[in-house]
Amino acid sequence: MKSKVVYIITTVKCSACKCMEYILKEIQKDDPTFTITVIDFYDVPEWIKNNVTLTDFPTVIFTDNNVIKYHFTGTLSGQKVIKIMNDINF
């Protein structure tokens, strides 16, 4: 079974991070094939730190079976996120 996870890397009081979490949860209502995991910057797993340079927040990372398919920093519209998900066959 494949495990699709969208990680949202955040920091304390990051309002853009909350916004991105809301956008992803809205997308998830129509596409329940992935889970969303919110992680504080200080708790990011080593395998993510080794593969993604965290320069700003939110950093959103799309993974499939712990393989990073795509990542971006900042807040995007739901339409743009859906396009990314379609482009990477997520």
Where are these regions (language model features)?
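Local sequence-structure signature of Cys/Sec-based thiol-disulfide redox active-site neighborhoods
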Residues: 1-29
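Thiol-based oxidoreductase modules, predominantly thioredoxin-like and allied folds used
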Residues: 9-11, 32-46
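Short alpha-helical
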Residues: 15, 43, 76-79
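Short, glycine/charged-enriched secondary-structure capping and boundary segments
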Residues: 21-24, 51-54, 75-77
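Secondary-structure boundary motif
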Residues: 26-33, 90
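Short glycine/proline-enriched coil/turn segments at helix->beta-strand junctions
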Residues: 32-33, 53, 65
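Short Fe-S-cluster ligation motifs
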Residues: 43-58
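Non-catalytic, surface beta->alpha helical segment in thiol-disulfide oxidoreductase systems
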Residues: 56, 61-90
